[in-house]
Amino acid sequence: MVTQYLLDTNAWIHYLKDPKSSIRGRLATISPRQVVTCSVVLSELLHGAEKYGNRIQRVDIIKSLLAPFSCLPFDEVDANVYASVRHDLELKGQVIGPYDLQIASICLRHGLLACDKQGL
């Protein structure tokens, strides 16, 4: 089975901001079929585009960047994973942000490796 990666929002931001990023180099060595994105990451990136000047240009860049990759939705099955994981974390006194938990839920359901700006 081929490993598939879901890059977190901060990984894509690092990719866009740093032409010499390790993420950019690693993506050049793997098949686009090994990388997926999700609706949560897309929404965070689009929100970032709304916050700054050149909104239309930024949205176009994001859409072009993510076009080669499948985009998984956060759906009802993922919501059930989210609820279970959040409950388990709360019992342990651990809390992570809701968007990160949504991304983690998608990764758990689909057997994906989550990657942040620290590396792919």
Can you describe what each PLM-predicted range is?
Residues 1-4, 101-120:
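Acidic, metal-binding active-site segment of PIN/NYN-like and related structure-specific nucleases
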Residues 31-34, 68-70, 108-113:
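Short active-site oxyanion
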Residues 42, 59-62, 79-82, 100:
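A general structural signal for well-ordered alpha-helical segments in protein cores
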Residues 9, 76, 100-101:
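Conserved glycosyltransferase catalytic-site signature
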